[in-house]
Amino acid sequence: VVVGAGLAGSAAAYSLAQRGWRVQVLDAAVAPAAGASALPAGLVAPHVSPDDAPLSRISRAGVSTTLARLAALLPAGTDWAATGVLERRVEHARALPPCAPGSPNPMDGWSVEASPERLAQAQLDQLQPATSALWHPCGAWMRPARLVQAQLAQPGIEWRGACAVARLQPTPEGWALFDAHGQTLAQAPLVVLAAGFSVRGLLASADGAGTQPSTESGSPLPLHALRGQVSWGALNELPAAARAALPPWPVNGYGSFLHGMDGPSGAPMWIVGSTFERGNTSAAVTAADHAANQARLQRLLPRLGTLMQPAFQAAQGWAAVRCTLPDRLPAVGVLDAVRWPGLHVLTGLGARGLTLSVLAGEVLAAQLHGETWPLEPRLAQMLLAQRFSRRSKP
């Protein structure tokens, strides 16, 4: 049983079903991708650091795995497109890692300094002081809900909506899952908790401690809530001058700007965001966050931000609560095999769910089956949830 039907849960279910498991996916919502994975559109792009840190290398593995999954399951140009992504660092330059003469460059095919022509296409070439940016030729945009739906539609997966899991209880055969009224929802030898921030409460219930630990520090998995809001609107409602200033591909680096894909209404849209607010668990759309997104766009693409300012007065919005972990990496697989045998997690993806969820599902399945890791073994070990149970033991 997988609890959670967003990017994390659907990726876990897909990877297990591909290996012959019969998987039930339970979610409190009546439709898949109802939480953070309902983002209208978002970016898949690598993280870059001057020392090519583990997060950067993990992100490249995530991009590669995600693009392969998108190509296999979704129509290109409709639900995703490998357009490339321009990354403009507003607050500080994002340097590429150095490459010793004669050594292979780890960034080949991934990221290069943006050319003057690309800066001109984004109308960034005349800024003072001069701006710099990176070009990610492998970058893409995607509609995450479409990937969730496609993964859950695979043979061997049964989707069950309106099944809010409130409590777990160990049984001789594995685990029983109950709703808030004590009704049994499912029983299984293996359970994957992929319900975002709700994983904290479900882990507490597995110990018989109710569903809400009193503090984040009291949870064996130190998840933190991270609220985000994006602003979006119809592309054809923008002034002609704003439409003429649109970059030909997505831009990120201080929030992000995308345009051209179909929005929830079916018409081509623009989308800006997202905000980041730690500790806030409200999914209400606010005018303050629309203003914050407009300010981000103003700094990311100054001319376009000025031209689009009136559009934010009528902008629509989407907000959700994601969750992160202190080391900014997801938690995947077994958390504590002695304390919770047969209980696995896939959570803590934060703002990188689009880039890392497919890879995380493959890591979970590889751990279960004793397979070769889908990325460097040392990097795979950094994703395993058991790193937190090891830290908590004397």
What is each of the regions a protein language model found here?
Residues G161-W175:
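A conserved short coil-to-beta-strand element within the FAD-binding core of flavoproteins
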Residues C138, G305-P394:
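C-terminal catalytic lobe of FAD-dependent flavoproteins
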